[in-house]
Amino acid sequence: MNSSHESLADVLVKICGIKRPEDAILADKLGADLLGLIHVERSPRHLTGRELEDILSLIPPEKAVIVLEPSDPVEVAEVIERTGVERVQLHSISCEDARGIKRVLTENGFNPGITVAVPPEPGSLDVLDHIPCSCVMLDSSSGGRTGGTGRMIPPELALGMLRLIRSHESAPEVALAGGLGPSTVRLNPEYLLEFDCLDFNSGIEAAPGIKDHAMMFELMEYMGRTGGLQKPSRLQRGELS
């Protein structure tokens, strides 16, 4: 999940849940390190195969992360083969799922960067013993499924889980998700120093799947990078004007 970047802290910025071309283009221009594209049908930010390909054509391939919640390990290999993406983010997978995904990827000769999303529960880290991942993402869960809740993880719990993950023998990078927005990083500056990546989705939206361009600019300005863009004289929700 490594990517070259300069900011006020050594932390990657991922803007996830991108559904509209204009949001993808702005996120890239503002200097986001990673752009998350959700290919999960239960999500209001779900991209169909065609929509996924359309967005991928607009952004640097090294920034693309496809978010999956596979019901079958073969789905992961199929998406990688179809899109050529270098990074995938896996949600709601069990240890058995992880073993199956590892086997299928190996059989097909794929070696993507893998992020595994887990809830802030110590037992959730067992999955790390069954699949090679470069990053673990802490995210809230509901009904046994990680992500999509928009709920923030309490800071003390998030930082405690961070330390626990750091002690794992695989020593993966650690990302934090769940309702993060500009105010989150202002109120919790330790996140900028402790986590390897911060994932912003619902916290910078006007509505599900519609990014608020004013909030995106505010976030990236605070992070010390706006891709050289000047703040427009008038910012409207969902669009620059």
Swiss-Prot record:
InterPro entries in alphabetical order: Aldolase_TIM (IPR013785), PRAI_dom (IPR001240), RibuloseP-bd_barrel (IPR011060), TrpF_fam (IPR044643)
EC number: 5.3.1.24
SUPFAM superfamilies the record matches: Ribulose-phoshate binding barrel (SSF51366)
Reaction(s) this enzyme catalyzes, per UniProt: N-(5-phospho-beta-D-ribosyl)anthranilate = 1-(2-carboxyphenylamino)-1-deoxy-D-ribulose 5-phosphate
Primary enzyme class: isomerase
Keywords: Amino-acid biosynthesis, Aromatic amino acid biosynthesis, Isomerase, Tryptophan biosynthesis
GO annotation terms (biological process): L-tryptophan biosynthetic process
Pathway annotation: Amino-acid biosynthesis; L-tryptophan biosynthesis; L-tryptophan from chorismate: step 3/5
Superkingdom of this protein's organism: Archaea
Recorded GO MF terms: phosphoribosylanthranilate isomerase activity
Keyword Isomerase: yes
Family: Belongs to the TrpF family.
Name of this chain's protein: N-(5'-phosphoribosyl)anthranilate isomerase
Organism: Methanothermobacter thermautotrophicus (strain ATCC 29096 / DSM 1053 / JCM 10044 / NBRC 100330 / Delta H) (Methanobacterium thermoautotrophicum)
Gene name per UniProt: trpF
